[in-house]
Amino acid sequence: MAHKKAGGSSRNGRDSAGKRLGIKTYGGEHVIPGNIIARQRGTTWHPGLNVGMGTDHTLFAKIEGHVQFRAKGNGRTFVSVLPIVAAAE
């Protein structure tokens, strides 16, 4: 006698929707205060200059400027927002 249950389809078919994580604003792109730079679980990317981190580890811009990603020697990647330098008139 078979002691394996038949592969019934009623046991299958459960899955969760994707959480839309990842980089939302790439290096060199312009941001304004409050723009989301990255959504993540944990600290894949760490906040650098002028970047804040929300309670769910979301990185966001604190000032207007351009996004910069920078890898440090310790294996961590930091995200900063560099202010826009006004042209001398």
Swiss-Prot record:
Where are the membrane-spanning stretches?
Answer: none
Q: The organism sits in which domain of life?
A: Bacteria
Region (Disordered) spans which residues?
A: 1-23
Tell me which Gene3D superfamilies the record gives.
2.40.50.100
Please list the GO biological process terms of this entry.
Answer: translation
Cite the entry's keywords alphabetically: Ribonucleoprotein, Ribosomal protein
Q: Provide a GO CC annotation, any one.
A: cytosolic large ribosomal subunit
Gene Ontology MF term list: structural constituent of ribosome
- Identify its protein family: Belongs to the bacterial ribosomal protein bL27 family.
Please state what the protein is called.
Large ribosomal subunit protein bL27
Q: Which gene encodes it?
A: rpmA
